A protein has these predicted regions:
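Generic cytosolic/nucleocytoplasmic N-terminal low-complexity/intrinsically disordered segments
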Residues: 1-2, 157
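C-terminal motif of bacterial Sec signal peptides marking the signal peptidase cleavage site
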Residues: 15-16
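N-terminal hydrophobic targeting/anchoring segments and the immediately downstream early-domain regions
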Residues: 20-36, 67
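Second-shell loop/turn segments in exported
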Residues: 34-42, 87-89
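Aromatic-lined carbohydrate-binding/catalytic grooves of carbohydrate-active enzymes
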Residues: 50, 54-165
Length: 165
């Protein structure tokens, strides 16, 4: 048994040292989100400007490929429960949300949008933004996913859980 143990160790070292191939490390998902700089004080022009800057300043080439419209775009839900964008911050309504995501895509970037898994958003909790009350995915998850992905053409949803029930 004592003779087999050193042979096993040598064999294990040879196999482990020769069978590994170096692999390229994938970078993490990188991009810009409106929350840290603007919280709920966002607008259509801020989002467009920031997306343009990602390309202009070379951040896209460095791997920053995502633009996320965070909390603050909410206006209210209509009678059918569909999200209507904030009328002052995004005065073009649903059509404008689609044109913003299309602009982001035209830059070769992915477009993201925000929601909360609960009933209310972080902005309603921390910034006293009344528009975030009832704006979360709770009881609207399928409806919001259809609107955000299919109608507004966003690629991903950033989901928080500030407004949990």
């Amino acid at each position: 048994m004592k003779k087999i143990y050193p042979i096993f160790i040598v064999f294990a070292l040879i196999v482990s040292c020769t069978s590994r191939q170096p692999q390229a490390v994938k970078p993490p998902l990188m991009g810009w989100s409106s929350w840290n700089a603007y919280m709920v004080d966002i607008s259509d022009s801020i989002i467009i400007h920031q997306a343009d800057l990602i390309v202009k300043r070379g951040l896209k080439d460095a791997g920053y490929g995502n633009v996320n419209i965070d909390d603050g775009f909410f206006g209210y839900r209509d009678q059918r429960g569909y999200m209507i964008p904030h009328p002052q911050r995004f005065p073009g309504g649903s059509a404008q949300m689609r044109s913003i995501s299309d602009h982001i895509h035209s830059l070769g970037l992915k477009a993201g949008i925000y929601s909360d898994a609960g009933d209310n958003t972080c902005g309603s909790s921390y910034n006293k933004d009344l528009n975030g009350i009832g704006a979360g995915l709770w009881m609207h998850d399928v409806q919001d996913a259809d609107q955000y992905f299919n109608n507004w053409n966003f690629d991903f949803i950033k989901i928080d859980y500030c407004g949990g029930i």
